[in-house]
Amino acid sequence: MYDYLVVGAGISSAVFVHEALKVGKTCLVIDKRDHIAGNVFCEEIEGINVHKYGAHIFHTSIRRVWDYVNQFAEFNNYINSPVAIYKDELYNLPFNMNTFAQMWDDVRTPAQAKAKIAEQVAEAGIGEPSNLEEQALSLVGRDVYEKLIKGYTEKQWGRDCKDLPASIIKRLPCRFRFDNNYFNDRWQGIPMGGYTSMVQRMFGDVEIRLNTEYRDLIAAQPDIAKRVIYCGPIDEYYDYKLGRLEYRSLRFESELLDEENHQGNAVVNYTEREVPWTRIIEHKHFEYGEQPKTVITREYPADWQPGDEPYYPINDERNTALYEHYEKLAADEGRVIFAGRLGGYKYYDMDKAIDAAFDLVEQELGVKIG
């Protein structure tokens, strides 16, 4: 009998397993996919680490997280500086002085940019915003909204901005300096050699069974472990008996191109509604690759259906209430602990997922990290 059966071979599981092995616990890791590393899995194609489930850029201001991951990989100095394309016009992201100078010919200083935005906000004349469109207009005015927010957001959610709640956008940060660094965090980069190698080092020599369903294993060996760390969907664990939690999903189309450099940037967003994909990722630029070929991936938002890969929890009133009911069931579990993005029905950046795993390690193993 193992001390722990760990369901899911992603980054949260890897942290827990690494620490459990250090204190002498035995673990079995299973995953229904045919690979480890969850959604940060990278596949090498023509010497390029391809992010199979969308772009993953590591960024954090949590020192203990940064120190921890650097035990398992050397990180490069990649800075996320995406570009947006709207009707063949190029704009830097996030919204900063470069963006405003590209958008308005008469804007060159922070004072001019602030005045232009204030003028357009006043023209919109929004009192209390009743939907996402009104919220955005009340924050940044019509030009930024129409060119960089409206179409992209409608593709992401599959609904018109007038039909989306204002609460989705609580604020729209505008930087009144020439700074294209998307994140504000202290540390940022990509693990050299890809995320899969990093996660493999975290797991060490633990036993991992891929293409393995939790239900099948437990049906055959109900007493295989004393405790279960379950990083799968919490509603699936309970056979959806209270109802299904909802997600937004994604679809990816990757293409190997016989050219050295396709778009000159790792991430290019397409913000007009008429272009069906939301962005194109050119993976080699994450690691400053100079390979003779390149791999690009078009990313399409998708309505989630049972059986699809769940990406983003829809934390609206209905789903939040349903998750809380499942959480009450989970509180009565004797040996099962729910963890990770799917177990907790919560979207995590990678650093927050790792930090939450640290808390689990402390709670379950009595080991404090950092």
Residue ranges and their predicted role:
Residues 11-12, 34-35, 98, 154, ...:
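Short, solvent-exposed loop/turn segments at secondary-structure junctions
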Residues 2-29, 361-364:
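N-terminal Rossmann-like FAD-binding beta1-loop-alpha1 element of flavoenzymes
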Residues 2, 24, 206, 224-226, ...:
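Short, well-ordered alpha-helix to beta-strand connector turns
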Residues 87-91, 97-226, 231:
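Active-site/ligand-binding neighborhood in enzyme catalytic cores
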